[in-house]
């Protein structure tokens, strides 16, 4: 039985990658398109003046992008993790591995995650677990990677669509609080593409969580992935569940939103999307599906070249926004329009204040 469970987990990991790559073949419309930065025609800064440095859980990083959690736990995904680690090392960006549950249950799979630290010995690596994982096991996940931080992913919608998924969630908050108090490294609580509301973020902040990844809808859709894995595809009605990255970001502009650090991910497509997310308060921006898609289609070298180009393009966008660094960018005026503006108004976000920031 144990062997069958291991095989099922390995197959699921491979299916996640294959279906995720397929989803990223065509970029979906993004709620970030409803966000417009108000720039300048007389910039104060030169491109060489721009400082893209940011901080993630107390660690300074030179570029506000990270490779978000996606994979590990099978022979095939070991190769992908190795290539992602090479990209992270060369571009000097943090990287999170996918859920390490498989390796915690089957030690023969540890190397499919550990390869990340072997290839990127000095980089910022985030371990990744579910709130289902008991503390001692979670500490093993951190040790496995010599991780700099721990991602705890919260994914009730995915679990409910997954036939073999969890059905009990009421203990999650207590478990997360235990990690916050006892983890030897900082904790980041992240969604998996269904987005966090300000109420969810407040619930987490109240137990001591200091950083969240809002991880909105718009990128890799794990409800669809799990539904596609089902023979009956019985959860078609849930494929649009959640809030988008744009919605999650403007929700954090509400006067009652908790004042904690947040990251943004979910449907990030280009440097302009990154700038919009940073301008709405994110400290850094995560990508998973698009990077794996680029890796699969173009290889490691081309993906590195693409991300290096993004650095230069990002500096240019900061110039246009009249911002020398991320702190200044967070005061750039923004116009929210379309469906995102309607949603924001119903959530009582002061869109006029956003449009006239200084």
Curated annotation (Swiss-Prot):
Free-text function comment from the UniProt entry: Involved in the biosynthesis of isoprenoids. Catalyzes the 1,3-allylic rearrangement of the homoallylic substrate isopentenyl (IPP) to its allylic isomer, dimethylallyl diphosphate (DMAPP).
Location of the protein in the cell: Cytoplasm
Organism: Listeria monocytogenes serotype 4b (strain F2365)
Binding annotation for Mg(2+): 159
UniProt-listed NCBIfam families: IPP_isom_2 (TIGR02151)
Subunit structure: Homooctamer. Dimer of tetramers.
GO cellular component: cytoplasm
One GO term (biological process): isoprenoid biosynthetic process
Chain residues that bind substrate: 12-13, 158
UniProt keyword terms in alphabetical order: Cytoplasm, Flavoprotein, FMN, Isomerase, Isoprene biosynthesis, Magnesium, Metal-binding, NADP
Protein name: Isopentenyl-diphosphate delta-isomerase
One Pfam family linked to the record: FMN_dh
GO molecular function terms listed in the Swiss-Prot or TrEMBL record: FMN binding; isopentenyl-diphosphate delta-isomerase activity; magnesium ion binding; NADPH binding; oxidoreductase activity
Binding site for FMN: 69-71, 99, 128, 190, 220, 267-269, 288-289
InterPro entries: Aldolase_TIM (IPR013785), FMN-dep_DH (IPR000262), IPdP_isomerase (IPR011179)
Similarity section: Belongs to the IPP isomerase type 2 family.
Gene3D superfamilies xrefs: Aldolase class I (3.20.20.70)
């Amino acid at each position: 039985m144990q062997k069958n469970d291991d095989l099922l987990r390995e197959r699921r990991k491979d299916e996640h990658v294959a279906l995720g790559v397929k989803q990223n073949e065509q970029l979906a419309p993004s709620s970030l398109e409803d966000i417009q930065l108000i720039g300048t025609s007389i910039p104060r800064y030169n491109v060489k003046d721009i400082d893209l440095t940011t901080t993630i859980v107390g660690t300074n990083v030179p570029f506000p992008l990270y490779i978000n959690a996606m994979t590990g736990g099978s022979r095939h995904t070991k190769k992908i993790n190795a290539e992602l680690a090479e990209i992270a090392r060369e571009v000097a960006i943090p990287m999170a591995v996918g859920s390490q549950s498989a390796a915690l249950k089957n030690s023969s799979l540890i190397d499919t995650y550990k390869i990340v630290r072997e290839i990127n010995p000095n980089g910022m690596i985030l371990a990744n677990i579910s709130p289902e994982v008991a503390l001692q096991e979670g500490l093993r996940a951190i040790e496995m990677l010599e991780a700099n931080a721990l991602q705890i992913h919260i994914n009730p919608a995915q679990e409910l669509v997954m036939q073999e998924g969890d059905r009990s969630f009421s203990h999650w908050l207590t478990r997360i609080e235990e990690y916050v108090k006892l983890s030897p490294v900082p904790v980041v609580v992240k969604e998996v593409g269904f987005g966090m509301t300000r109420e969810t973020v407040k619930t987490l902040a109240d137990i001591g969580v200091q950083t969240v990844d809002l991880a909105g809808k718009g990128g890799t859709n794990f409800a669809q992935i799990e539904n596609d894995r089902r023979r009956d595809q019985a959860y078609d009605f849930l494929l649009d569940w959640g809030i988008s990255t744009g919605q999650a970001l403007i929700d954090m502009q509400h006067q009652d939103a908790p004042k904690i650090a947040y990251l943004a991910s979910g449907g990030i497509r280009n440097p302009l999307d990154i700038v919009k997310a940073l301008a709405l308060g994110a400290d850094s921006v995560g990508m998973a599906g698009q990077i794996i898609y680029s890796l699969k289609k173009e290889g490691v070298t081309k993906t590195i070249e693409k991300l290096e180009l993004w650095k230069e393009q990002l500096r240019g966008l900061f110039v246009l926004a009249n911002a020398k660094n991320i702190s200044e960018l967070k005061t750039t005026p923004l116009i929210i329009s379309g469906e995102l503006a309607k949603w924001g108004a119903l959530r009582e976000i002061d869109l006029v204040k956003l449009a006239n920031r200084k």
